[in-house]
């Protein structure tokens, strides 16, 4: 059965979110593995991230966030972990999942080993989630979470530091 046939956001339950949290930790470990290579090859960032940063400089922060956090993960996951493996490669889904994983990596434009590790590793983890649990919603949710953390991390850090600021500066903001 295709993941598109039984698409249902109600499957995102607390146990599913807990499982996705473990996969999120695995994705972060993948990023830690890729970072030394990226640092050596490209100053610590990917060409894809540089392009997103450039686009961000010309787009409203919230609108860009909606695209990065909602639109891109839904479209990428549906294409790479549902349409390619289950429709285009119907009857040969394992090969289709691998093809989808490679296509996802290709979409992010890797040109160095560090970028291949970063995006290829992320793609394999997201693919495993979709393949193992036969629920595209899980990989979409995981992808959205990862992008949200990456996109809004400065805001999250500031919010976390706000209580510390108040302690040291006695509520004088």
PLM region descriptions:
Residues 20, 28-31, 61-173:
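Transmembrane helix-loop-helix hairpins at the membrane interface
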Residues 39-58:
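Membrane-interface interhelical connector segments
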Residues 5-13, 52-60, 89-91, 116, ...:
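Helix-boundary and loop/linker segments of multi-pass membrane transporters
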Residues 1-21, 41-44, 84, 134-137:
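Membrane-helix interface linkers and caps
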């Amino acid at each position: 059965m295709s993941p598109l046939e039984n698409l249902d956001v109600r499957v995102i339950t607390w146990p599913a979110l807990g499982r996705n949290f473990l996969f999120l930790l695995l994705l972060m470990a993948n990023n830690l593995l890729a970072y030394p290579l990226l640092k050596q090859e490209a100053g610590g960032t990917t060409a894809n991230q540089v392009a997103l940063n450039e686009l961000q400089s010309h787009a409203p922060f919230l609108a860009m966030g909606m695209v990065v956090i909602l639109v891109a993960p839904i479209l990428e996951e549906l294409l790479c972990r549902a349409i390619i493996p289950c429709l285009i490669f119907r009857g040969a889904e394992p090969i289709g999942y691998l093809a989808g994983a490679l296509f996802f990596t290709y979409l992010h434009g890797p040109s160095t080993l560090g970028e291949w590790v970063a995006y290829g590793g992320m793609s394999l983890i997201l693919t495993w989630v979709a393949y193992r649990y036969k629920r595209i919603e899980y990989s979409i949710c995981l992808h959205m979470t990862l992008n949200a953390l990456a996109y809004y991390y400065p805001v999250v850090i500031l919010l976390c530091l706000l209580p510390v600021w108040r302690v040291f500066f006695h509520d004088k903001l």
